[in-house]
Amino acid sequence: YMLLGSFLSPLRNKRTDEYGGSLLNRARLLFEVLDAIKETCGREFPIILRMSGSERDPQGNTVEDMKRLIPYLEQHGVDCFEISGGTQYERCNKIIPCHGEEEFTNLKEAREIKAVATKPVITVGKILDAKLAEDVLEAEEVDGVVIGRALLADPDFVEKAKEGRYEEIAPCAACGVGCVGEQTKRRPASCVINPLAGRELEFEEQPAKEAKKIL
């Protein structure tokens, strides 16, 4: 989203040399970085590229632009695509979708990119429902999902889902208050759902002395 994303985006890249203008020119620096990684680390070194499936701006890159770019990125050594959305500037709420955004925010673009890619495609963006995530994977809509904030809310999210204990998962509110909000203030991440998040070494989790039925 920062340097390489700015070069790739027509919203930010106003250069008139070989690094600006057309889609492939805007991607030139990214291609060079990918080539340098493979040259330095070896062809077997895996590269996962996180990219916006769509910048969601009338003047920005669209999913069609990204689909055109996929074969070139594979030629330059990308082994897996992680599909996000938006930009660091105009559509930051799409990068970290909050409670007003739909779940699986970038799934539509990820599906379209998977249709043209020969490498695995994974998606990220407000993936909060474990059962829905399993359904998406079982339907092979994408090859993988990336879960972030939901693991702050409940570090046992994956284990509970694996055991079918969906109702026991503490649900992420997608509020962005403790995780994103605290980081913007240069403070350690926390979570309004999980008071132990970011403080695991300060407090030891203890079982309740007496069980209570809340609802």
Where does each model-flagged region fall?
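Flavin-dependent oxidoreductase catalytic cores
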Residues: Y1-L215
